[in-house]
């Protein structure tokens, strides 16, 4: 029902199967022997391990699932009826080490904004900012068409200001903006809107995207190619 929910058949009727498209996926690991992701469709620029550590089977599950939903093969030996949305697309996978969600909701601290754009008492995000800048530089330099990001930080975007976000992530924003690249050629960044629904019993308002997926709400230069997405149930209702 998922393919029907996104009207995939209309795209297929126009010949849009993912052919000649590369999907970037950043996640904790990928089983590159999985039947859904044929080795011939996995970019040689992929990085399947991190910090000289190879992800274990558990760490590969989520990334393998995401890759299968995005680009799982149409034709395969076991004739399973499942296939990915863009079943002819290539995949460039970058594995990064991800932490387990905290049991308690703990929104990230971006310091204090005095209302005039001046930020104080902010933690040092230089290392994290450099990391994301270098990560997105990989996709941009390789002209990857679209990138899936199923990770992030706790904290509703409406609880932050433009000044706070720019202060914490200047290089990330610059890389995502892709200045000098025509809109039609920019890499599109797709984000899971967030996992705050898991903290509903703690009174968290989860009706807004979290920090990274919601960044385009505050940063004009990444609007149009940074997208927050949600999951829905079979009735079309946004999942909890």
Residue spans of the language-model regions?
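Solvent-exposed, polar/charged alpha-helical surfaces in well-ordered, non-transmembrane soluble domains
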Residues: 9, 23, 64-68, 133, ...
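Residue-level detector of conserved, well-ordered beta-strand and adjacent loop positions
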Residues: 38, 43-44, 51, 213-216, ...
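Substrate-binding/specificity loop regions of serine endopeptidase catalytic domains
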Residues: 82, 152-240
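Short coil-to-helix leader/linker segments, especially the first N-terminal amphipathic alpha-helix
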Residues: 1-9
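Soluble or luminal CAZymes and related metallo-dependent hydrolases
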Residues: 3, 123-131, 164-169
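Short, solvent-exposed secondary-structure capping/transition elements
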Residues: 4-5, 79, 133
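Subtilisin-like serine protease catalytic core
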Residues: 9-46, 53-127, 140-145, 156, ...
């Amino acid at each position: 029902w998922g393919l029907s929910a996104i009207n995939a058949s209309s795209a297929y009727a126009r010949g849009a199967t993912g052919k000649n498209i590369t999907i970037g996926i950043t996640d904790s690991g990928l089983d590159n022997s999985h039947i859904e992701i044929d080795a011939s469709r996995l970019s040689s620029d992929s990085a399947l391990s991190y910090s000289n550590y190879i992800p274990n089977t558990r760490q590969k599950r989520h990334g393998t699932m995401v890759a299968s939903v995005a680009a799982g093969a149409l034709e395969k030996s076991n004739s399973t009826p499942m296939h990915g949305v863009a079943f002819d697309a290539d995949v460039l996978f970058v594995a990064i080490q991800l932490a387990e969600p905290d049991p308690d909701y703990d929104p990230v601290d971006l310091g204090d904004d005095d209302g005039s754009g001046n930020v104080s008492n902010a933690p040092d995000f230089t290392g994290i900012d450099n990391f994301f800048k270098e990560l997105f530089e990989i996709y941009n330099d390789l002209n990857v068409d679209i990138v899936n990001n199923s990770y992030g930080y706790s904290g509703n975007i409406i609880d932050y200001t433009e000044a706070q976000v720019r202060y914490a992530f200047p290089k990330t924003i610059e890389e995502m903006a892709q200045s000098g690249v025509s809109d039609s050629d920019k890499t599109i960044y797709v984000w899971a809107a967030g996992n705050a629904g898991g903290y509903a019993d703690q009174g968290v308002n989860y009706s807004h995207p979290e920090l990274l997926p919601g960044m385009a709400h505050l940063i004009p230069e990444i609007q149009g190619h940074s997208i927050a997405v949600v999951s829905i149930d079979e009735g079309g209702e946004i999942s909890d």
